[in-house]
Amino acid sequence: MSNMPVLIITLLLFSMYISTAAQKPTEIKCRYPADCHIMCRKVTGRAEGKCMNGKCTCYY
């Protein structure tokens, strides 16, 4: 039997974990992604974020 399906599932789960660990949801209200850049720089040190459901989500 091949170990390829197990490897693919493991990589998929690991990549999903990494992507959620790199996000920091905030309570900062926004209307546009540009509203989040200054606040995300204060929270994470990087101006990378987007406006989702009216609140900023910052990325590391």
UniProtKB/Swiss-Prot annotation:
<dbReference type="GO" id="GO:0015459">
    <property type="term" value="F:potassium channel regulator activity"/>
</dbReference>
<dbReference type="GO" id="GO:0008200">
    <property type="term" value="F:ion channel inhibitor activity"/>
</dbReference>
<dbReference type="GO" id="GO:0005576">
    <property type="term" value="C:extracellular region"/>
</dbReference>
<feature type="disulfide bond">
    <location>
        <begin position="36"/>
        <end position="56"/>
    </location>
</feature>
<comment type="similarity">
    <text>Belongs to the short scorpion toxin superfamily. Potassium channel inhibitor family. Alpha-KTx 12 subfamily.</text>
</comment>
<keyword id="KW-0964">Secreted</keyword>
<dbReference type="GO" id="GO:0090729">
    <property type="term" value="F:toxin activity"/>
</dbReference>
<protein>
    <recommendedName>
        <fullName>Potassium channel toxin alpha-KTx 12.7</fullName>
    </recommendedName>
</protein>
<comment type="function">
    <text>Inhibits voltage-gated potassium channels.</text>
</comment>
<dbReference type="InterPro" id="IPR001947">
    <property type="entry name" value="Scorpion_toxinS_K_inh"/>
</dbReference>
<keyword id="KW-0528">Neurotoxin</keyword>
<dbReference type="Pfam" id="PF00451">
    <property type="entry name" value="Toxin_2"/>
</dbReference>
<feature type="signal peptide">
    <location>
        <begin position="1"/>
        <end position="22"/>
    </location>
</feature>
<feature type="disulfide bond">
    <location>
        <begin position="40"/>
        <end position="58"/>
    </location>
</feature>
<keyword id="KW-0800">Toxin</keyword>
<feature type="disulfide bond">
    <location>
        <begin position="30"/>
        <end position="51"/>
    </location>
</feature>
<keyword id="KW-0872">Ion channel impairing toxin</keyword>
<dbReference type="InterPro" id="IPR036574">
    <property type="entry name" value="Scorpion_toxin-like_sf"/>
</dbReference>
<keyword id="KW-0632">Potassium channel impairing toxin</keyword>
<keyword id="KW-0732">Signal</keyword>
<keyword id="KW-1015">Disulfide bond</keyword>
